[in-house]
Each structure stands twice: as structure tokens, then as C-alpha cells.
């Protein structure tokens, strides 16, 4: 589970920082949740949790549910937040985020 990789306390802080609609910033979130300093292997484990359909990619609908992977009661990202997140992570322009792209995004 995600709490094997990041702490409940850090999840609380990260979710608190994005509670307001439109406030999601992936760089701040990854820093607050403690992922920015984790290894590529840990980032890959988180990627595998986010990739709900196990396609090997995080698609736009999965990105919308991003916060709920950290806590089921968290809000859904808005379309604008989801699009910006996808654009930031999709370096090859295929409309989805692969594992290497996610690892780079976490470190950004």
C-alpha cells in the first residue's frame, strides 16, 4: 500500500495543501508527501498503485483520481488540474504517463 512508501503524517500534510479546488501543484504535493526524495524504485511502486487498470501507463482518468490513491476521502482533481498534471508528465506527447515519465515528474 502507499503507506509502505510514504507516511500518514506526510499524506495528511500533502492533502491539506491541495484541499481547495484548483490548488493542486504536483511539485509541492510530491515534496510534501515525501516522494520527491525517494528512490526511482519507490517512485515505480507508487506508479504501479496509480496505474489502476495495470496498462503500464497512467491515463487521464486515473490522474483525476490521483489524490484518492493517498486517501479514499480525498477530492477528485478538476479537469484543468488533471490536464496540467498530464501535460507536465507526458514528455513524449502520447497522452499518458509512463513509468519513466512518472519517475522524472516526481524528481522535477
From Swiss-Prot:
Domain EF-hand: 38-73, 77-108
Highest rank taxon of the organism: Eukaryota
SMART domains: EFh
Residues given in the record as Ca(2+) 1 binding sites: 51, 53, 55, 57, 59, 62
UniProt miscellaneous comment: This parvalbumin has an isoelectric point of 4.5.
Role played: In muscle, parvalbumin is thought to be involved in relaxation after contraction. It binds two calcium ions.
UniProt protein name: Parvalbumin beta
Species, as recorded: Pelophylax lessonae (Pool frog)
